[in-house]
Design a protein with these regions (language model features):
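Active-site entrance/lid segments in N-terminal catalytic domains of soluble metabolic enzymes
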Residues: 1-199
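Conserved active-site-proximal phosphate/metal-binding subdomains
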Residues: 16, 164-207, 213-362
């Protein structure tokens, strides 16, 4: 596998561990991946619940919690640490400022177009900025806006395909449409980015994400022009993952039929593992219409059947009567819990085997 270079950062293994909230990827998982030569990513989503003891104010608790997680990751790891901050979060600006102040290596940002992300950088900032997109058009808009308004271009871009877990940047009818597959979109994004690279003489690596599960998958997308990959689902079933054992076991026990598309209160489709809670939602369950968090810009709790941050927090703790686990399309393929070291070693070995010429091709 080739080294992944993002600005002056070099990851020995071109694997980014995707940010997963609420509480699934914190300092434990991120530092473990970074120590193995990949890029570990802390999710900023929902930290106000995990760190509610630090402040009665959800936003303040979340920012204090994020700073604490970044510092813990730094203590545990010598490698590259990133933070995922969704544009849809109401405290997006505060979380970005905290990440930059803590000198995190990279901010990954999706669930909306992060058009003002460079505005938070200061002259002495070292943090790299990496948007997450679902189309060539989206990265073109971001590059043009960033260059025109801030004289800045993305340090890399993540293209997240429709087989990813969690919230999806696609309409529901596009999820099974081959025209929107990762393999179809990736060359388009690589070509779009190349125009800005050539015009402004800046390298912008494209990272492929969504449904990448094996070393063979990594080889396939890198042959299509990706400089690296982002994996989330594969890292959930690791000993270092910050989720509860019950959360991890929900992946191990899942069958292919259990992976389903849901309508999130955020207003986007999402991919999750079937649970009793989701059955209640489909049956018309209505929860109290009071929201103490206001954590998502697009979420009007008076029109939604449940609070998503509470549901995801419950799942993080293993309470599936009152929550559910987001998961990628390949979550059902998981058979056991292993260490991050074992997982990355397995991915590398799979990649090496797929890179060997077959007898017939010699």
């Amino acid at each position: 596998m080739k080294t992944l270079t993002i600005g002056d950062l070099k990851a020995r293994i071109p694997i980014i561990q995707g940010g997963m909230g609420v509480g699934i990827s914190l300092s434990g998982l991120a530092s473990a991946v970074a120590n193995e030569g990949g890029i570990g990513v802390i999710s900023a989503a929902g930290l106000g619940l995990l760190y509610k003891k630090l402040s009665p104010n959800y936003t303040e608790a979340g920012n204090l919690g994020l700073a604490a997680e970044i510092r813990k990751a730094r203590e545990k790891a010598k490698g590259i640490i990133g933070v995922n901050v969704m544009v849809a979060l109401s405290d997006f600006a505060e979380l970005v400022k905290t990440s930059i102040a803590e000198k995190v290596d990279i901010i990954f940002s999706g669930a909306g177009l992060p058009l003002d992300l460079p505005s938070f950088l200061k002259k002495d900032s070292v943090t790299k900025l990496v948007p997450i997109v679902s189309s060539a058009r989206a990265i073109r808009i971001i590059c043009e806006k960033w260059k025109n308004n801030y004289d800045y271009l993305p340090d890399a871009v993540v293209l997240e395909g429709p087989k990813a877990g969690g919230h999806l940047g696609y309409k529901e009818n596009q999820l099974e449409d081959e025209h929107f597959s990762l393999e179809e979109l990736l060359p388009q994004v690589v070509e779009e980015v190349s125009h800005f690279e050539e015009k402004y003489n800046k390298r912008i690596p494209v990272i492929a994400a969504g449904g990448i599960y094996t070393g063979e998958d990594i080889k396939r997308v890198m042959d299509l022009g990706a400089s690296g990959v982002q994996l989330g689902t594969r890292f959930v079933t690791t000993t270092e993952c910050d989720a509860s054992d019950a959360f991890k076991e929900s992946y191990v026990k899942a069958q292919e039929k259990d992976i389903e598309i849901i309508k999130s209160p955020v207003g986007m489709p999402g991919r999750a593992i079937h649970s009793h809670f989701l059955e209640k939602v489909k049956a018309g369950m209505k929860q109290p219409k009071v929201c103490p968090f206001n954590c998502i810009k697009t979420c009007d709790i008076s029109r939604r059947p449940y609070c998503i941050v509470t549901a995801l927090y419950n799942a993080f703790k293993g309470n599936f009567e009152n929550g559910y686990a987001f998961a990628g399309s390949n979550a059902w393929r998981t058979t056991r819990i292993m260490s991050v070291k074992e997982t990355i070693s397995e991915l590398i070995n799979e990649w090496k085997r797929s890179d060997q010429p077959t007898l017939s091709s010699r």
